[in-house]
């Protein structure tokens, strides 16, 4: 399929990665972006277009820079470990400029429909209808990469909150929240304790008279900052920790995580402890919530049973009067209306092989990129998905039979149903390392730790015990990057660089302790490599 045209729908993080992957494989990408700029979710707008992903002005990303970068383009070392949304967008602009991606994007262009050509069973081609400034055009493409994300359509379940129609105060979805000023001096209820709900409750509590955070189940709250000040995802995302989880089981892993989170504050005492285990729900990442709760600025409440004109009555019988505003941080739903019947979404559930390919197509020339909710960054997963999809489009990689794909999809869905609480939020979950390793295997770029243990033991040890960063998948195989080894071995330097803005007496106690721990674990490396890899 070399030299063939591929339509890329959306110019957010996934779309940019797809354009670059197409170029690397000799394909001709044409990216359609409905707005006038790149960035998708991460481009803040005070008044976003309908159907476009939207964030609030203060958003800080929940994954650290080393874990979220594109695999052959590290984020500058002076950038903070957890970046403001404007810095995330700046990084995307740098990436697009570095690899010359902008010239392949048609801005202000909406994709109206993507239909199979009459000869699709033999050609695998698609007819893509677009509209730009009132003018419609149709073009034929040999492949389609859908990168529209899953934070576009606000999920607002008003039917679950009787009386909301007579509530005299203001109510809105978190998508429409931008800053806290308009809630100054007011009594506000935030419904939902995901990442957005927690962030909004904290931010509004600095100006509001009182904030109530309503939750049906409670939540486990994870801090961005882990032991010794390292980013929490850096500490938790190693192949060794994944290995320990596999051999000890989820029960032990749950107990470990819950103990760590309860060491920071007692979730039961703060009214947050859920009935489910830590790994049965996407944890809420929030650094400030316990501080706002202990100061009384945020009060945790149960689920709202009903609203009156001015009050909220909760399921435990308690009541809060004189409520001025209600913010529904109740998540999002996703759909692909332009695909018609090619990809069906029912209750936020979709059947995709490896969360990428529809299993029912005669030709594998359509892929959904970035439709996953990992405990970790989406960007590197999207990039690996794009690398795999372009190889499939070219015929260099093949998919199993339809029946085999459907069997695996069913098995994955059953596994997810057993692990996670039933929620619209938990239909596209995926473990970060497991997903990355699985797709890397399919692409042929998963590092061979056993081989490296003999040829480059220092690197092998870092790959096993250090954070599983996206750069690991540029060490070998197709798309190998010469700077990968050095970037992997200097990850700690880039973590420390933005923090060390004041000269102090050097203290190597933490580093020495971490190094000693690595050497202690190194003696078990060969045995683990033989068993696990």
Curated annotation (Swiss-Prot):
Coiled-coil blocks: none
EC annotation from Swiss-Prot or TrEMBL: 1.14.13.8, 1.6.3.1
Post-translational modification Phosphotyrosine, affected residues: 56
Residues annotated with Dimethylated arginine modification: 5
SUPFAM superfamilies: FAD/NAD(P)-binding domain (SSF51905)
Name of protein: Flavin-containing monooxygenase 5
Tissue: Kidney and liver.
Chief location category: membrane
One of the GO BP terms on file: xenobiotic metabolic process
Keyword terms: Endoplasmic reticulum, FAD, Flavoprotein, Lipid metabolism, Membrane, Methylation, Microsome, Monooxygenase, NADP, Oxidoreductase, Phosphoprotein, Transmembrane, Transmembrane helix
Positions bound to FAD: 10-14, 33, 41-42, 62-63
Name of the gene encoding the protein in the UniProt record: FMO5
Record field: transmembrane: 513-533
């Amino acid at each position: 399929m070399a030299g063939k045209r591929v339509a890329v729908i959306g110019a957010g993080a996934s779309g940019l990665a797809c354009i670059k992957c197409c170029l690397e494989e000799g394909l001709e990408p044409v990216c359609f972006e409905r707005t006038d700029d790149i960035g998708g979710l991460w481009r803040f707008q005070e008044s976003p277009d309908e159907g476009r992903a939207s964030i609030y002005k203060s958003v800080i990303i929940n994954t650290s820079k080393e874990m979220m970068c594109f695999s052959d383009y590290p984020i500058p070392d002076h950038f903070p470990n957890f970046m403001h949304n404007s810095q995330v967008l700046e990084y995307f602009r740098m990436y697009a400029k570095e690899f010359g991606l902008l010239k392949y994007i048609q801005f202000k262009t909406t994709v109206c429909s993507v239909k199979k050509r009459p000869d699709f069973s033999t050609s695998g081609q698609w007819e893509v209808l677009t509209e730009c400034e009132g003018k419609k055009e149709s073009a034929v493409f040999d492949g389609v990469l859908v990168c529209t994300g899953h934070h576009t359509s606000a999920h607002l379940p008003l039917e679950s909150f009787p009386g909301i129609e007579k509530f005299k105060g203001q109510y809105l979805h978190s998508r429409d929240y931008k800053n806290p000023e308009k809630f100054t001096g007011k009594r506000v209820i935030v419904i939902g304790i995901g990442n957005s709900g927690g962030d909004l409750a904290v931010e509004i509590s600095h100006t509001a008279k009182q904030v109530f955070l309503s939750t049906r189940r409670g939540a486990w709250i994870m801090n961005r900052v882990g032991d010794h000040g390292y980013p929490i995802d850096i500490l938790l995302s190693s192949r060794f920790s994944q290995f320990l989880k596999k051999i000890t089981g989820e029960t032990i892993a749950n107990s470990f995580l819950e103990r760590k989170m309860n060491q920071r504050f007692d979730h039961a005492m703060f009214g947050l402890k859920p009935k489910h285990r830590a790994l049965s729900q996407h944890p809420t990442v929030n650094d400030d919530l316990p501080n706002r709760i202990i100061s009384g600025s945020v009060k945790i409440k149960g689920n709202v049973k009903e609203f009156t004109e001015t009050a909220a009555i909760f399921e435990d019988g308690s009541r809060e009067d004189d409520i001025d505003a209600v913010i529904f941080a109740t998540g999002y739903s996703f759909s692909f209306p332009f695909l018609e019947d090619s990809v069906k979404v029912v209750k936020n559930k979709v059947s995709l092989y490896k969360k990428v390919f529809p299993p029912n197509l005669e030709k594998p020339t359509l892929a959904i990129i970035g439709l996953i909710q990992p405990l970790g960054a989406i960007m590197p997963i999207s990039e690996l998905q794009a690398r795999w999809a372009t190889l499939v489009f070219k015929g260099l990689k093949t998919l199993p039979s339809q029946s085999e794909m459907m069997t695996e999809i069913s098995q994955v869905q059953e596994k997810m149903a057993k692990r996670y609480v039933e929620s619209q939020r938990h239909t596209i979950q995926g473990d970060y390392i497991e997903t990355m390793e699985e797709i890397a295997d399919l692409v042929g770029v998963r590092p061979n730790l056993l081989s490296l243990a003999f040829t480059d033991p220092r690197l092998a040890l870092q790959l096993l015990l250090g954070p599983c960063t996206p750069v690991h998948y540029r060490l070998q195989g197709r798309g190998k990057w010469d700077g990968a080894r050095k970037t992997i071995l200097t990850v700690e330097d880039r973590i420390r660089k933005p923090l060390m803005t004041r000269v102090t007496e050097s203290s190597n106690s933490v580093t020495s302790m971490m190094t000693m721990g690595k050497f202690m674990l190194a003696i078990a490396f060969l045995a683990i490599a033989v068993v696990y890899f």
